[in-house]
Amino acid sequence: NVRQCMEPAHVVSIDESLLSAVTTISAHDYVLVQAPDKTIGGIVTASDFNEQFRILAEPFLLVGEIENGVRRILHSKFTANELNEAKVPGNDERTIESPSDLTFGEYVRLIEQDKHWKRLNLEIDRAEFVGRLNRVREIRNDVMHFDPDGLDRADSSFLREFAQFLKRLRDVGAI
């Protein structure tokens, strides 16, 4: 008899927040979603939840990976005074001691100067690299300010490719 193999269904209201359903999804791998008229309107599985988490988390993780790559490029190449020169004007109370104290825009300000770029010893086009960094900065601002539209495919793809590019530079010993 099929009834003997059944287990109780795990049901949540369609109005319940996804966050509150996480525990049930985690424990049982799914929840059934119940409409106000008590009909079952759908199912949310652990796989659905994992994919949604990946979509939301991936941009943050990629931006972090890219920032770490840029910091690695800049590490030990500049004095604290030179790093402070990249600071946004009027931000005098902030002290910059290492590349990790710079904002993303300040990375761009620092390396767009030819004299600073030369110190990095990267055999790639400065304007192209700075342009890509600037695009990362723009995407980063959308990501960090929780753009309700999320990240479009082109921006996600760009972040993945740029993170991979920095990884290749590291793998070949360029940084």
Predicted regions and their residues:
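Amphipathic alpha-helical interface elements
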Residues: 15-35, 39-138, 142-175
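Bateman (tandem CBS) regulatory domains
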Residues: 1-10, 45-48
